[in-house]
Amino acid sequence: MSNIGNVEILQIIDSVAREKGISKEILISTVEQAVQAAGRKKYGNEYDIKAQINRKTGEINLLRILKIVEDVEDYLTQISLEEALIKNPEAKIGDEIYEYLPPIDHARVSAQAAKQVITQRVIEAEREKQYHDFKDRKGEIINGIVKRIEYGDIIVDLSRAEAIIKKDQLIKGENFKPNDRIKAYVQDVRQETKGPQIFLSRVDNQMLVKLFKLEVPEILESIIQIKSVARDPGSKAKIAVFAADSSIDPVGSCVGIRGNRVKAVTNELNGEKIDIVLWSNDLAQFIVNALAPLAPGEITKILIDEDRHKVEVVVSQENQSIAIGRRGQNVRLASQLTGWNIDIMTEEQESKRRNEEFLTSTALFMEALDVEEVIGQLLSVTGFNSVEQIASSEISTLTRIEGFEEELAVEIKNRAINYVDLKNEKIIKKLEDLGVEQELIDILELSLELILQFAEYGIKTIEDLGEMSVNEFKNLAPNSNITDENIKLLIKTARQHGALKDS
């Protein structure tokens, strides 16, 4: 039997528990496990050994556990009922008998166990506590102190926790030093066994949204809604705002008296200039608003191509640079804000492009449908720019064209269908020859022509798609109406398919 007072261990445990905010019982149990491991090392792993620490005195006992059975098969872990009754008159089959083992060097073992195991358990418990304290704070703005800088990443002290701002999540040009105060957006909280668990960002769009919520009470109270955000962090941003109550001026409310509200946000984001525009469910009007500082009256024409998810904005020569912005920043942010690909062109450019498209589509229709030039021109003028559009159109749409009787309309539609079918057959044959998986064709849901472009680029399987980046996808399919989010979802789905195949 070991009957050694070890009040010092309890004092250490009590001190650590208070300082680190960790359960005292967890630390005691951890030390018991370490002493138990030392006992098994001395007496043999074949024994069922248990360590006990008295929660009041610190007394340590090392016990051998024997299971009471009818027929003893293992004398190291079992005991007969007859023998057990000698030790405990109330013993019965299935109970356990505890025998005290001779002491080991508890002073040394306990001290080492306390030092090593408590240290490790404190680290684990602190990480668990950090995760549980912050997992529900994802999506918040948080304040901290710069603790240190590691290879461009900033380690932030959050009092009882540490967070990290990766280099690519910092605004370009920012220069933080140890002990600087810093404000950031909690982008993610992950339970990890090592390394950072709390990930912060200063470039996330939601950082801007949360800052406006702090500065504009009407946003916090949902009187004003931020409908969309586009950022070039540290340089320029655009936000689209809306108020259901027509008596509220959402733009003015966000700007504030003498610009005090928007200035507060700008100052926090290293001088990032912010255009606050009015959101509208009328796409054309929203496009006009999003292109600020271009004045609405300077826009000559807006052409919306829903099939290609593209908008062409026609302006005068002198206003083109304003609309596009420095290095294309204004139109790029407006495109992100509205979710549409916006193309700025002058009246001269638009006229030239239309003429080129007219000539190209006319020639295409003449060749593909085997029709005279005048019919090809009429189809082009009506707005058709592909044979596929004609093949999928209603007969009633074609008969609206001047001079198109029903018989002619049916004939042209049939020729278009035959042309498209033949073209698709040829593409399918090429896809088969290239070894493209049918599963890839199904998941992409793009035209066969675009899928052929992917295949010729080397994307032939689900796994190939999973290895693509969003930019690679967009470069291969620049005119598709797939949003960045949907592209990410496609790639993610492809990766999951690949993982299932490997498992």
UniProtKB/Swiss-Prot annotation:
Segments forming domain KH: 308-378
Cell compartments where the protein resides: Cytoplasm
Cellular-component GO terms for this entry: cytosol
One GO biological process term: transcription antitermination
UniProt KW keywords: Cytoplasm, RNA-binding, Transcription, Transcription antitermination, Transcription regulation, Transcription termination
Keyword RNA-binding: yes
GO MF term (any one): RNA binding
S1 motif domain span: 139-203
Function: Participates in both transcription termination and antitermination.
NCBIfam families the UniProt entry points to: NusA, nusA_Cterm_rpt
Family from the record: Belongs to the NusA family.
Quaternary structure (record): Monomer. Binds directly to the core enzyme of the DNA-dependent RNA polymerase and to nascent RNA.
Name of protein: Transcription termination/antitermination protein NusA
Gene: nusA
